[in-house]
Swiss-Prot record:
Record-linked Gene3D superfamilies: 1.20.5.1500, Nucleosome assembly protein (3.30.1120.90)
Ranges of compositional bias, category Acidic residues: 297-307, 348-360, 366-375
Keywords linked to the UniProt accession: Nucleus, Phosphoprotein
Compositionally biased residues, Basic and acidic residues: 122-163
Protein family membership: Belongs to the nucleosome assembly protein (NAP) family.
Organism encoding this protein: Schizosaccharomyces pombe (strain 972 / ATCC 24843) (Fission yeast)
Residues recorded with modification Phosphothreonine: 20, 24
One GO BP: nucleosome assembly
Gene Ontology terms for molecular function: chromatin binding; H2A-H2B histone complex chaperone activity; histone binding
Region described as Disordered: spans on this chain: 1-38, 122-164, 288-307, 346-393
Regions of compositional bias (Polar residues) in chain numbering: 21-31, 382-393
Chain segments annotated as transmembrane: none
Protein name, as recorded: Putative nucleosome assembly protein C364.06
Listed GO CC annotations: chromatin; cytosol; nucleus
């Protein structure tokens, strides 16, 4: 799981700020829930107690920064010995991470024939064999699961249906982080998505490949998004995320889903004449995923910001969700089974009453935009409404 931390600092002193790949250990031990809390004296309002506590805090800070050098020589030698053992552990952990990455690459090659067969069935290039069908039915019986809504409403006929329509779009919409990126306009284009694949590079990193059938939105047959890890490992000898690169989408005329057309009125200050112009402004779309945020360079520290860090972390997490969730278990996301397993904690959202003052304040707010008027994007491929706000930018 990606850590909720700053991920764009590459300097050695800040390596711990970068997230680690989803399937690597975080390097921290589990909390000891059985441990007793430290006993702290009750703080009264008297100055005497406050001064005593202040003195204890000062001694702790002193021990943290300088106390080791003041310990007896024999104790310092033992600490040096522990550091030597820690170095041996770190070397082994570094070797483990490298071998784990190579193991992932090796098994990716073994998974490839399975995913290829899945792609053939989804796009309608081939039908599943009797053996494949029997194994799937046997797995359903072993799990003794209740039928999903899609299974309980089987439709008659459908013999002319090719493959599994909107397989990947449906699966993606069942993954929370991915569904939040998809706008109503995006669905028309994503319905032409026939496969999503992952491949590994020689250098640490992975590539996502999105294959599309011919469609009225863009000319690309395959769109890729590549995630790169840093060459040098972090303090825990795990791979650290560096940056991502995506393909440019070659949009067909008037079909760009990442922009919308806005009609604006302009007035000449001298002649007082007005004219109407149309400009394109960015809008939310899943396809912004292929134009990832760029981490600032090491020299450009001024461009660092919490907002950029959040965008970088979100972009990396989305890539991990494709890699670790959607691609390995696509059919379970399509049927909704994986979504049920995600809700393992048994908690559900509760209805919370809003503060009356907040509700009244919100109802009294007015939004005025006399200068701009959203116009129909006039996409030749569809006539859906403008997208709702989503996280991916």
């Amino acid at each position: 799981m990606v850590e909720n931390v700053n991920i764009n600092n590459k300097r050695a002193g800040k390596m711990s700020a970068a997230p680690t790949p989803h399937n690597t250990p975080s390097g921290t031990s589990a909390p000891n829930f059985g441990a007793k809390a430290p006993q702290v004296n009750t703080i009264d309002e008297g100055d005497e107690n406050l001064e005593a506590i202040d003195g204890k805090l000062g001694s702790l800070l002193h021990l943290t920064s300088e106390g080791v050098s003041e310990l007896p020589e024999a104790v310092q030698r033992r600490i040096s010995g522990l550091r030597g053992l820690q170095k041996r552990y770190s070397d082994l952990e570094s070797q483990f991470q490298k071998e784990l990455f190579e193991l992932e690459k090796a098994y990716a090659k073994k998974y490839a024939p399975i995913f290829k067969r899945r792609s053939e069935v989804v796009r309608g290039a081939d039908e599943p064999t009797e053996e494949e069908i029997k194994k799937g039915e046997a797995a359903d019986e072993n799990e003794k699961k209740e039928p999903t809504s899609s299974e309980s409403k089987k439709q008659e006929g459908g013999d002319d249906t090719k493959g599994i329509p909107e397989f990947w779009l449906t699966a993606m919409k069942n993954v929370l982080s991915l569904s939040e990126m998809i706008t109503p306009e995006d669905e028309g284009a994503l319905s032409h998505l026939v496969d999503i694949r992952i491949s590994y590079m020689e250098k640490p990193g992975f590539k996502l490949e999105f294959e599309f059938a011919e469609n009225p939105f863009f000319t690309n047959k395959i769109l890729t998004k590549t995630y790169y890890y840093m060459e040098e490992s972090g303090p825990s000898n795990v791979f650290l995320y560096d940056h991502a690169e995506g393909d440019k989408v070659d949009w067909k005329e008037n079909a760009d889903l990442t922009v919308r057309t806005v009609t604006k009125k302009q007035r000449n200050k001298n002649t007082k004449q007005t004219r109407v112009v149309k400009v394109s402004v960015p809008r939310d779309s899943f396809f912004n995923f292929f134009n990832p945020p760029t981490p600032p360079s090491e020299e450009d520290e001024e461009s660092e910001s919490p907002e950029l860090d959040e965008l970088l972390e979100l972009d990396y997490q989305i890539g991990e969700d494709f890699k670790e969730k959607l691609i390995p278990r696509a059919v379970e996301w399509f049927t909704g089974e994986a979504l049920a397993l995600e809700n393992y904690d048994g908690f559900s959202d509760l209805d919370v009453e809003e503060d009356e003052d907040d509700v009244e304040s919100s109802s009294n707010e007015e939004v005025s935009d006399s200068d701009e008027e959203d116009s129909d994007s006039k996409h030749t491929a569809h006539g859906q409404q403008n997208a709702a706000e989503c996280r991916q930018q």
